[in-house]
């Protein structure tokens, strides 16, 4: 896939990615930075994943790819249970490594690292102390996407991941800068859909879709 700076009519059949954020975890309830922490789903998170799986059962999915962290694998396994597809893990779809901020709330980080937090919010090249910048996340997520989509034109692939990787893919589809991540909100167990065309253009079909959670 080549980046385009302007829209042109897409040619051929796209590879379709359905992007599913994992269900609720104890750290998402407490609004704590949860990057590499391998926390499981809560009971509510399991129910959310099951609701997403019920919706995706008839979505024509050809493959399921997930971040290797427990919360994403548990979510993906719910979909695997209704589709009969195996779950393949891809390390590139892990959440951001938040370094010294892991497990803390925004307020706690702001109190202890005020200047570092300000710099991080202003520049995607800046990483948390001991962690990973959004620019670095973008590089590995984009590389993972290329690996997953290779040879899959015309297929529908479910990618079960986290807030930052999913927002990164949305920004890439829209040709938006990394700073756009700060302008997006993504709920737990929310779905997004993107068409990726081999000749370059991408089409964002839906974002933060949680209709399955209200049924």
Where are these regions (language model features)?
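Short hydrophobic/aromatic-enriched beta-strand-loop microsegments
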Residues: 40, 83-91, 177-185
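Phosphate-coordination/substrate-recognition cap region in phosphate-metabolizing enzymes
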Residues: 2-12, 51-117
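Short, hydrophobic/glycine-enriched beta-strand segments
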Residues: 16-22
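General small-molecule cofactor/ligand-binding pocket signal
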Residues: 18, 88-90, 205
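Loop-to-helix element that buttresses phosphate recognition and phosphoryl-transfer chemistry
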Residues: 24-79, 125-142
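Active-site-adjacent alpha-helix immediately C-terminal to a catalytic or transition-state-stabilizing loop
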Residues: 7, 73, 143-201
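Short, solvent-exposed aromatic-acidic interface loops
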Residues: 205-215
């Amino acid at each position: 896939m080549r980046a385009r700076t302007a829209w042109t009519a897409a040619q051929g059949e796209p590879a379709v990615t359905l992007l599913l954020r994992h269900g609720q975890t104890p750290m998402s309830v407490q609004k704590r930075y949860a990057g590499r922490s391998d926390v499981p789903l809560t009971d509510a998170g399991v129910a959310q994943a099951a609701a997403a799986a019920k919706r995706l059962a008839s979505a024509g999915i050809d493959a399921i790819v997930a971040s290797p962290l427990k919360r994403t694998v548990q979510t993906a396994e719910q979909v695997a249970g209704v589709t009969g597809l195996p779950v393949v893990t891809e390390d590139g779809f892990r959440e951001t490594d938040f370094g010294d901020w892991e497990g803390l709330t925004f307020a706690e980080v702001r109190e202890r690292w005020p200047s570092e937090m300000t710099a991080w919010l202003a520049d995607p090249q800046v990483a948390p102390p001991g962690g990973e910048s959004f620019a670095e996340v973008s590089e590995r997520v984009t590389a993972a996407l290329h690996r997953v989509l290779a040879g899959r034109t015309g297929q529908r692939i479910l990618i079960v991941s986290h807030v930052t990787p999913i927002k990164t893919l949305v920004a890439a589809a829209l040709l938006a800068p990394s700073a756009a991540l700060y302008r997006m909100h993504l709920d737990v167990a929310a779905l997004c859909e993107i068409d990726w065309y081999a000749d370059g253009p991408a089409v964002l079909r839906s974002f933060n879709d949680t209709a399955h959670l209200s049924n």
